[in-house]
Amino acid sequence: MGAILGKKIGMTRLYNDKREAISCTIIQAGPCFVTQVKHAEKDGYDAYQIGIGERDEKKVNKPMLGHYKKAGVTPGYKIAEFSKSEINLELEAGAPLDLSVFKEGEKINVLGVSKGKGFAGVVKRHNFGGGSRTHGQSDRLRAPGSVGGSSDPSRTFRGTRMAGRMGGCNITVKNLEIIRIMPESNLLVVKGAIPGPKNSYVKIVSTKK
């Protein structure tokens, strides 16, 4: 069991022993450090707060700067919380966290925010088929059709699929295989795609199975 915070670098392809091309994602997982240790007696739950990267102090507001200095670490770019059962180590504030908690071939879950696509219609957002392309119709090709009932129920049901903001949601991709670990450069190569654009931050957690 292990967990760490990482930044998505991009995608590439690697070849396995069978000379098959495998799509992979490169993640920069570190340098990470513990910024706070939360205890059930004081905070109501047990967790580790993890930071990643080193940021110029001039670009950090005073409350966050004080938070980092209390832990005795340099300001980072991102902070995220992990439960103690996910990290499965005894750590103190200021302690470093690296890729030694993982091994090649291990399965992980990656949590991130998907790419935001803005306001989208029902054809793009929910894969609707649209209206008929015949009988002189001109403006019903990508329309949703009827969304309500008649006099009974006289309303549109909550949760009806309609146009709206698409993307920008919390996504978890499960059971991705670690292809390669490069501890000297804090790089992690995983099989397949992970959520979010380049340079977005993700949480990496070992699968519980």
UniProtKB/Swiss-Prot annotation:
Gene this chain is encoded by: rplC
Organism annotation: Chlorobium phaeobacteroides (strain DSM 266 / SMG 266 / 2430)
Subunit structure, interactors included: Part of the 50S ribosomal subunit. Forms a cluster with proteins L14 and L19.
Protein name in the entry: Large ribosomal subunit protein uL3
Family: Belongs to the universal ribosomal protein uL3 family.
Function of the molecule: One of the primary rRNA binding proteins, it binds directly near the 3'-end of the 23S rRNA, where it nucleates assembly of the 50S subunit.
Ranges for region Disordered: 128-163
PANTHER family, A to Z: 50S RIBOSOMAL PROTEIN L3, LARGE RIBOSOMAL SUBUNIT PROTEIN UL3C
GO cellular component, one term: cytosolic large ribosomal subunit
Classification via Pfam families: Ribosomal_L3
InterPro entries, alphabetized: Ribosomal_uL3, Ribosomal_uL3_bac/org-type, Ribosomal_uL3_CS, Transl_B-barrel_sf
